[in-house]
From Swiss-Prot:
Pfam families assigned to the protein according to its UniProt record, in alphabetical order: DUF4093, Toprim
Role this protein plays: Required for correct processing of both the 5' and 3' ends of 5S rRNA precursor. Cleaves both sides of a double-stranded region yielding mature 5S rRNA in one step.
Annotated EC: 3.1.26.8
Binding site for Mg(2+) 1: E11, D59
Protein name: Ribonuclease M5
UniProt xrefs under InterPro entries: RNase_M5, RNase_M5_C, TOPRIM_dom, TOPRIM_RNase_M5-like
Nucleotide-binding as UniProt keyword: no
Organism: Mycoplasma mycoides subsp. mycoides SC (strain CCUG 32753 / NCTC 10114 / PG1)
Cofactor info, note text: Binds two Mg(2+) per subunit.
GO biological process terms, semicolon-separated: rRNA processing
Lineage: Bacteria, Bacillati, Mycoplasmatota, Mollicutes, Mycoplasmataceae
Length: 177
């Protein structure tokens, strides 16, 4: 099994426990303690990102999206992201989180990291609208391709596509044009 060199940012202890059950006790995580993410934790994440890199791996719910966005907005440079879909969560669980996902879904997410760079601008809003990428049917296809949650807003998808440096031609290939 591949050893993960970066620090993984998760929401809580159960997420850390789940990841360590898969990757071993040498795996390093930082827990945001849910939405109580504070400046000190953000500074620590920034320091680790500059030294060894971090992977943001938050739950596929509203709080997880907000935590991910807060961290990305705080960091100045590239950051790795892992995504898990709600469909990958144990159906009998009342919670929607990393701790409730299957081992295979977690491995797949961490094997398919996506790099975000806030400084990328590969797509204009006009191009995004004129090519109908904002339409729900196209957003679903794009989100599925990148393993994003299907319920992200059009503006968030636009921003994330730019941060990943995805071109118009790339998106057209994804949606089958």
């Amino acid at each position: 099994m591949n050893k993960i060199k970066q620090i993984i940012i998760v929401e809580g202890k159960t997420d850390t426990d789940k990841l360590k059950s898969i990757y071993g006790n040498d795996l390093k995580t930082i827990q945001t303690k849910g939405l109580s993410l504070n400046k000190k934790t953000l500074e620590m994440i920034e320091e680790f990102n500059n030294k060894m890199g971090v992977i943001i791996f938050t739950d596929p719910d509203g709080a997880g999206k907000k935590i991910r966005q807060t961290i990305i907005d705080y960091l100045d440079n590239k950051v790795l992201n892992a995504f898990i879909k709600k469909d990958d969560i144990n159906k009998t669980s009342k919670k929607i989180g990393i701790a409730e996902a299957s081992d295979d879904a977690i491995k797949k997410a961490l094997d398919n990291l996506i790099i975000y760079d806030k400084n990328n601008v590969s797509l204009s809003w006009t191009d995004y609208i004129n090519n109908d990428f904002y339409l729900k049917s196209n957003r679903i296809v794009i989100c599925k391709y990148f393993n994003f949650d299907n319920n992200i807003s059009s503006k968030t998808l636009f921003k994330w596509l730019n941060w990943m440096n995805v071109s118009i031609d790339d998106i057209k290939k994804i949606i089958g044009e």
